[in-house]
Amino acid sequence: IVSDFVGNTPFVKLSEKLYAKLESVNPGGSIKDRPVKWILDKSEQMGLINKNSTIVEATSGNTGISLAMMGAERGYKIKIVMPCDMSEERKTLLKMYGAELIEVDEGDFDGAIALKDKLVHDKGYFPLNQFSTPLNIECHYKTTFKEIVSHSLKIGKSITAFIAGTGTGGTLMGIQKGFSEYEPRVKIVAVEPLESPVMSGGEKGLHGIQGIGDGSKFLVDLKKVDEIITISTEDAKIRAKELCKN
């Protein structure tokens, strides 16, 4: 099945001292395949969901795509609550996988989460809860972190810093937990949009870097983060294009 191919993504050399984990090769196209599969697997094992379950989640897109894909694979009904300003490609993919898309105002992740919670309360839907479940952190601690260490040992390189764009905070905190035990000197760096610098102490705002900067720090424990970097939407686009060319 498709979800059997989640994880074990390539370690790509970008420069002499910089490597990237290529999460885009996951079946759903993003790192969000990992926590979605992990949460579904754990929920099935605990008997919290079955073939008659309807699963709902608030998302900026990637988690929704992963959930819609795996929902189609496993036979679940999927409902996705998403701000209306997310890309049309994401909306199309969700619908192609058979998910029902419910849109809220642009950039309104608080509203998306509130509506998701209301559907859980009123309809009895099962919430994935990517923004709050410790399973999100556990997933990256048990899988992504171990893969990073394994890759570094294979190429004979020591890791001095880990940098991640931050949405729910699951990736960042899972990797941080791993390095706190394995090599505490590794620097943990979070990246967020300049237009919505919530972790930096600023106000949330609209931005164009879909997938990070969802308006709150959510799972992020700032005491465990060594540095926070902000980047503008325009600069992020320029750098992404440069990376693709090189």
PLM segments and residue spans:
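PLP-dependent amino-acid enzyme catalytic core
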Residues: 1-246
